Amino acid sequence: NILSELVLSFRDDFAKYRNKVPSSRIDATFRSIAEQGLGKFVYNRVDTDASTAQIKTATETLILAGLVYPVTHSSANGIPLGAEINEKYRRMILLDTGLLQRILNLDISVILSSDDIQVVNRRAMAEIFVGTELVKSASCYSPYPLYCWHREKAGSNAEVDYVVQLGTRIIPIEVKSGSKGTMQSMRLFMEAKGITQGIRTSLENFS
C-alpha cells in the first residue's frame, strides 16, 4: 500500500533529526497530532515520557519538514493577520488526509458513508482537507500561514476554523463535515469584527 509505505518512509527519516531530538519523540508527536484531531494541540497528551520542551522541539521539526501545518489563533482585528497571533493556541494538521487515514487505521468508506460513526475523525479530515487546500492555493516558494479564531468564555466558547486574508478583506471559513450544522461561531465573529462575508463548506448542495 502506497500510503503505508509513505508513513514508514517518513518515520525512517525522523532519524535524520536525532541531533535535535530523539527520533522516537518525533514519531510519538507525529502520531499524537493525528490522534488529537480537533482543537488545541496539547503537548502533555503526547504518549511519551519526554519533557514539554522536547515535544515542542519535535513539533517544530515536523513543521519545518512540511509534514505538519500549524493553525494559529489570530485576534483578526485587521491585516496582516499575523500581527495579532497567540501561539499558545494552535491546532496542528497533517499534510494529507490519506496519511491521517492510514496512521489511525480508519476505514474511509465508513467515514464517508456513515452519519454518526467516527464523527470526530470525519470532522478532523474535513478540516485537514480545507487547510491543505488553502496551502496548495498559495505560492510554492513561501510558506502559507494558517490562522483560526478562538474565544474562550465561560459557557460560550467559539471557534472559526480558518481565517484568511483576501486582499484587504478578512474572510472567516467554517468547515462542516456533513450537511447540517449551525454557524454560531462564524456569526459571532462577523458581528464582532464588522465583517459581512464568510465561507461555509459542507456536504450540502449549492442552492
Predicted features along the sequence, with ranges:
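Charged/polar, solvent-exposed surface patches and flexible loops
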Residues: 4-12, 16, 28-31, 48, ...
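Interdomain motor-coupling "hinge/lid" segment immediately C-terminal to the ATP-binding subdomain
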Residues: 1-40, 63-66
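A cross-kingdom feature that marks ATP-driven nucleic-acid transaction machinery
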Residues: 57-207
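Short, charged, low-hydrophobicity "junction" segments
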Residues: 5, 38-45, 71-72, 78
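Amphipathic alpha-helical scaffolds
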Residues: 39-55, 59
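Short, solvent-exposed loop/helix junctions and linker helices
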Residues: 23, 49-52, 124, 128
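C-terminal helical "lid" subdomain and adjoining coupling/linker elements of P-loop NTPases
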Residues: 1-2, 13-21, 47-50, 76, ...
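Short hinge/gating elements
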Residues: 12-17, 42-45, 111-120
